Amino acid sequence: MKVVLIQDVPKLGKKGEVINASDGYARNFLIPRGLAREATPEVLKQLEKEKEEEKKRLEALKRESENLLSELHKHVFKIKAKAGDGGKLFGSLTSANISDVISKTLSKEFDKKWIVLDNPIKALGTYDVTVKLPGGVSGKIKVEVLREE
């Protein structure tokens, strides 16, 4: 029996896939538990429509992320922090600190999960920080750490 998976099912398939399952398995397990629906022409048509909508949504998300990345490239984000002699910071700067500065500079919400730091920043200077935005868009931004007077 052909069924369309409504949810990811381990060792069987991912959401939206059309699979062949034995009649008993489909009728007694998958369909009653809400894991799958029978693959009728109407269901297949609806599945195609949902895939198209998801594709359009992902394209819009990618376009929005590319615009945000180009806006990020226009700025050098300056962060003031207390530092001792030799330029070492008292403490460190994390992705949360950087996202706060970006949010204030751009007047937009910027999630700290989008910033990829291998290690926290612990010294004064200019750094290239990797950002991974939704939609698979990534790039580097400039962050300058200055001494707080």
Swiss-Prot record:
- PROSITE patterns xrefs: RIBOSOMAL_L9 (PS00651)
Could you tell me which NCBIfam families the record lists for this protein? L9 (TIGR00158)
Task: Give Gene Ontology CC terms.
Answer: ribonucleoprotein complex; ribosome
Q: Which InterPro entries match?
A: Ribosomal_bL9, Ribosomal_bL9/RNase_H1_N, Ribosomal_bL9_bac/chp, Ribosomal_bL9_C, Ribosomal_bL9_C_sf, Ribosomal_bL9_N, Ribosomal_bL9_N_sf
Is Plastid there in the keyword field?
no
Q: Which family does it belong to?
A: Belongs to the bacterial ribosomal protein bL9 family.
Name this polypeptide is given: Large ribosomal subunit protein bL9
Q: Which keywords describe this protein according to UniProt?
A: Ribonucleoprotein, Ribosomal protein, RNA-binding, rRNA-binding
Single Gene Ontology MF annotation: rRNA binding
Q: Name one GO biological process term.
A: translation
Which domain of life does this protein belong to?
Answer: Bacteria
Disulfides per UniProt = none
Residue ranges the record marks as coiled coil: none
PANTHER family in the cross-refs: 50S RIBOSOMAL PROTEIN L9 (PTHR21368)
